[in-house]
Amino acid sequence: MGGASKKPISTVEKRMKKMAEEQQKKQQKRATTKTGKELTSKNVVIDNETLKKVQEELKKETIVTPYTLSTKLNVTISVAKKILEELERQGVVKIGTKDRRTAVYIAAS
């Protein structure tokens, strides 16, 4: 009837080590993003190299959606949407149809 026995010190130390390692792993996961290149900031800077790749893809296809662009450039869909919006402002592409979810862009030629 004496009650539960205390756990040995080695068991407590092992548990503390495990918890510390798990916290380190969680912090490392938070530091990296899905692509590994982009930071977690909301501002997306589109470099000239990416724009050249997009323009080459536009020459191959007549219709482009954010999904098709994101799969070919290996970027997220939100980044692809921003790229297409920027190209529309520049006059490189035109919006064919726009839905509440997707937009279909046509190469302006």
Swiss-Prot record:
Xref: Pfam families: Ribosomal_S25 (PF03297)
Organism placement in taxonomy: Archaea, Thermoproteota, Thermoprotei, Sulfolobales, Sulfolobaceae
Annotated segments matching region Disordered: 1-36
Highest rank taxon of the organism: Archaea
PANTHER family, alphabetized: 40S RIBOSOMAL PROTEIN S25
Entry keyword annotation includes Zinc: no
Keywords associated with the record: Ribonucleoprotein, Ribosomal protein
Protein's recorded name: Small ribosomal subunit protein eS25
Composition bias type Basic and acidic residues, residue spans: 12-25
